Amino acid sequence: LCNPLNGNFEKYINDKTILVSCMYVNNETGLILPVEKLAGLIESSGAPALLHIDAVQALGKLPVNVCSLGCDMLTVSAHKINGPKGIGALYVRRGVRVSPLTYGGEQENSLVPGTYNSPACAGFAAALHELGDKDAQHLKNLYGHFVTRAREFDFIHVNIFGEHAPHIINITFDGYLGENVLHYLEEFGIYTSQGSACSSHSKKKSRALAALGADKRTADCSLRISFDFDNTVAEIDEFFKVCAQIPQNLIRCYK
């Protein structure tokens, strides 16, 4: 795991590098990675590496154009745009050969045994069809309102590490353990997360925050907030109404 924003990306690729895989949008911080720049660096290095982009968190929130991104492969998932769970899509640039991970059938271009889940595929297509510019703008409006409200509290800090997607916010409740705040918010029907779902059972410091230079205190006291297309400004106001009571109800673990 490396931070491609720190200027040292080139030292990780050489003539033995066959694949570079990166997120378009980090799922803990909302940070947008400069994937077009990474594609250029790989090409100029002369390395034989293919570039794979995990665009799961970008779909529906940012433009996803495989030509302008310069990728060889790209993956997205339906559930992030209110489509069915368990179905995704893999883009493979013409000329790139992909070998199957499992064998047993040739009917689906010899990539997977069995048959694709046609109803889920249709559901994914329908969800894509329903996406519009107004959805992305709505998320931007929610993000702006959230950041404005957060400035009203001296113990709440929005962690912005660079260019940012509009639907994921990483915030620090200074002095209060993120896990304690998470469970406190749950009592009011407000559900957040500490880190990504992929590492929800890990007690270690977030690798994403560490790579971006966050110290242990910041990582311990941070939560991830994410918005859906159906969230409202009123719900954000309710969130901060509950947060205002944190100093009266929780013990500070850092001074």
Features from the language model and the residues they span:
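Pyridoxal 5′-phosphate
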Residues: L1-K255
